[in-house]
Amino acid sequence: MTSATSIRAVAVAPLDIPLHVPFGISGGAQAMANNVLVTLELADGTRGYGEAAPLPPYNGETQAMALAALRTAQAWLPGRDAAEWRALAAEFSARGGAGCGSAQCALEMALLDAVTKRRGEPLWKFFGGASTTLETDMTVTTGTVAEAADAARAIRARGIRQIKVKVGGAGGPAGDLARVAAIYAAAPDAPLILDGNAGISRAAASELVRGLRAAGITPALLEQWLAKDDLAGAAALIAESGWRVAADETACTADDARRIAAAGAAQVVNIKLMKSGVIAAWELATAARAAGLGLMIGGNVESMLAMSVSACFATGIGGFEFADLDTPWFMATNPFDGGFAVTGGMISVAGITAGHGVVPKE
């Protein structure tokens, strides 16, 4: 007899969402979220949804790569039991999904959504139910000094307390300093996270630290300024600045967390489900915590679907000091209903009663 959790169908489709403004990081910018939606339908009609959000300037992954990886699952996943989600995720990885972390993430999201939705369990409880609220920042992407100041004022007008600033742009340290100073003047009480996306050299990092110190600006966090493999440089940046440093591109697996801690290369790791999938992110969070590293939850340019999974993940596990779950607000349209609620910068998942709570609009 067919199990109620047997997978009946797998649908994979592009998910293209225009942005209000280009989302720029040190490696480039994009004006459209070119993502992928995967839908799993179980034998009893339950549907689970997952999102791949590849970000070419971040790690080189593209929508075409995610589509190709997920479409391979259409050949072997039907007839398999979604209740065996961990084994199915491992099989997808072994069949090539591991080559595209955002695709791995999308499949795992869809599996977990279907399984927890069917049994009436919210995903935040599945992850541990530690809490239901989380405070997010909002990002000022790369751009001009005037645009940075305007964005900072708009962020504070939304009631958001923390501001993340993309640095490492074409203007070099002087350009970064001018933008950060303008943001600081516009929102002097806002904790600032300065994110280099691995695009700043050691020399430029030292110059920017000196400039910030001279301007009287003390960031709350320096996020991945240096190349992802430069652990010694990151440790030196901590010593030189005296400020806290977060690893992002460097931290993709549990082994990465242990290497970072051993090298003294960061005090915080930014966990993104899109890097290697939900399961790998869970293992990374466990290893980071065991190594004494603080936790941050972030993402790529993701819709409410993927961001709600990240919110469930972070609130359910608990102990996340920083959160950067703002990209749904950069999108000109929202193709989904449901997900987390937000007031100012405070996210609540309490209203999610089964799965991640997000469904495509009719």
Q: Across the structure, where does each feature detected by a protein language model lie?
A:
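N-terminal small/glycine-rich loop or linker at the start of catalytic domains
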Residues: 117-142
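Active-site beta->alpha loop and helix N-cap motifs at the rims of alpha/beta catalytic domains
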Residues: 121, 138-150, 154, 173-176
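Conserved, mostly hydrophobic/aromatic
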Residues: 7, 38, 45, 107, ...
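Structured beta-strand/loop patches that form or line metal/cofactor-binding pockets in enzymes
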Residues: 2-44, 48, 52-58, 333-336
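Catalytic domains of carbohydrate-active enzymes, especially glycoside hydrolases
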Residues: 155-166
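Catalytic core of soluble alpha/beta enzymes
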Residues: 167-308, 332-342
